[in-house]
Amino acid sequence: MGPWFWTFDALGVPDWVAQRLWWGTLLFAAISGVAYLLRLFRLPALAVWPAALAYGLSPYAVAYLGRLSGVLLPAIGLPWLLGLTISSIRVRSWRHPALFALVVATVGSVNLTALALVGVAPLLWVLFALVSREAPPRRILGAVARIGLLATLTSAWWLAGLTVQATHGIDIVRYSESAEVVARTSTAFEVVRGLGYWFFYGGDKLELWIEPSFQY
């Protein structure tokens, strides 16, 4: 987000324009990511685009786009990470692993836990490819090695900072969003409603953090 808004500020673009372009870019990235993923399975356009729009315009995405858009980055990167994993296995090259690493560097610096969760999908596909023999094991492991190497290199800048923070910094999460607080709102019913994110329910002595949440 920093480079994005710095660039538009340097160009003299009003903040509200840069913000709305940012929102539009996030929605486009989410929708096009799902479309890219589903096309790898050779699904017809009649199936691809409704699914892509449903993912990009889900209640969760729309609810937090205007207030906590950075939280959505791992979810936006999920279809791209899965699709690029599939392509890395099917096509032996450095191109798709490099794109995978760029996506990780873009969406992973905000929340490592969320990145780990979305990383389960590519991992499961690797296991599926090995079990189903979609490709020779050597090619699959080679793709994993290329992805791991490049993703580590492109993420070193924020992994280093995170390591320093974890070692010498204050345990801020204990006071701001403990596991108990986060889990309390993530019930099955709320998740089905497209909600469940703890910040949506929070407030202080002055007001709710997200005022429209009261009616829900």
Regions found by a protein language model. Name each.
Residues 1-15, 107, 204:
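Short hydrophobic/aromatic helix or loop-helix immediately within or flanking a transmembrane segment
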Residues 13-17, 43, 109, 139:
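Juxtamembrane loop-transmembrane helix junctions in multi-pass integral membrane proteins
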Residues 25-41, 46-131, 143-162, 168:
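Membrane-embedded helix bundles of polyisoprenyl
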Residues 1, 148-216:
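Periplasmic/ER-lumenal interhelical loops and adjacent helix-loop junctions
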Residues 133-141:
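Membrane-interfacial, low-structure loops and terminal tails that flank and connect transmembrane helices
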Residues 9-13, 90-94, 208:
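Conserved helix-loop functional segments at active or binding sites
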